[in-house]
C-alpha cells in the first residue's frame, strides 16, 4: 500500500472500511502477496485511513508501504512533508536508479531544485556516483525522517562494467553504516 498516492492497476484490492478487512483475510489464504489501496481516481490509489492501515498491518508477515514516490524518475529529494513514514515502521528502504549517473540533475530528478540544493550543485550539473552516496546518507535525502533500520537499493545496474563503480558506492556508504543492495532486472 502507500502513505501517499501511487499508480492504480488492476491488481490492487481496493478497501474503504473496516468490513473490507475480512475480504483481505480471505484473499491472504489463497495468495502470499497482495496490493491494497483506497481508490482516489481511475489512475491513482491513496493512503488508507491510519486505523484501517494498523488493522491491515496485523494481517501480514511483511508489509511494504510506499512512503514517497518519484514520478518514475530515478532520483529525488523529499519536500518538507515527505516522506510519510508511520511510527510502526521497522525498516526503511531508500531506492535510487543507477541510470541517473552521468545525467543532468534537471533531466533525471523529481524535484530537481531540491536535489540541486541538497547536493550544492546547479541544475545543469551532472550526477556522479558520489552524489548517489550523498543522497543516500543525507538527513534531507533518502534518510529523511528515518528512525529505524535503513538500507538502500540502487536499481538498474544493468551492465557488468558498472560493478566497480558499485563497489565504490558500497564502500562509501559503509563508512556511514548504510547497507546497499544493487539490482538489475534485465
Predicted regions span which residues?
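Conserved catalytic-core segment of NTP-binding enzymes
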Residues: 43-58, 68-176
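Conserved, well-structured core segments that form the ligand-binding/active-site neighborhood
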Residues: 1-5, 12-13, 59-63, 67-71
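General beta-strand structural signal in soluble alpha/beta enzymes
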Residues: 1-2, 34-38, 63-67, 94, ...
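Structural motif
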Residues: 37-40, 155-158, 185
Amino acid at each position: 500500500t502507500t502513505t501517499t498516492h501511487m499508480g492504480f492497476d488492476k491488481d490492487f484490492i481496493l478497501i474503504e472500511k473496516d468490513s473490507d478487512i475480512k475480504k483481505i483475510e480471505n484473499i491472504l489464504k489463497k495468495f502470499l502477496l497482495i496490493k491494497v489501496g483506497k481508490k482516489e481516481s481511475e489512475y491513482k490509489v491513496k493512503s488508507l485511513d491510519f486505523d484501517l492501515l494498523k488493522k491491515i498491518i496485523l494481517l501480514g508477515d511483511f508489509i511494504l508501504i510506499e512512503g514517497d514516490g518519484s514520478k518514475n524518475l530515478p532520483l529525488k529529494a523529499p519536500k518538507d512533508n515527505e516522506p510519510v513514514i508511520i511510527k510502526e515502521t521497522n525498516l526503511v528502504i531508500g531506492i535510487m536508479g543507477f541510470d541517473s549517473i552521468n545525467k543532468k540533475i534537471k533531466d533525471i530528478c523529481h524535484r530537481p531544485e531540491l536535489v540541486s540544493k541538497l547536493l550544492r550543485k546547479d541544475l545543469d550539473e551532472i550526477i556522479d556516483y558520489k552524489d548517489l552516496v550523498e543522497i543516500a546518507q543525507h538527513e534531507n535525502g533518502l534518510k529523511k525522517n528515518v528512525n529505524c533500520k535503513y538500507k538502500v537499493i540502487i536499481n538498474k545496474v544493468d551492465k557488468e562494467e558498472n560493478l566497480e563503480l558499485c563497489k565504490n558506492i558500497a564502500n562509501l556508504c559503509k563508512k556511514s553504516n548504510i547497507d546497499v543492495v544493487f539490482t538489475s532486472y534485465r
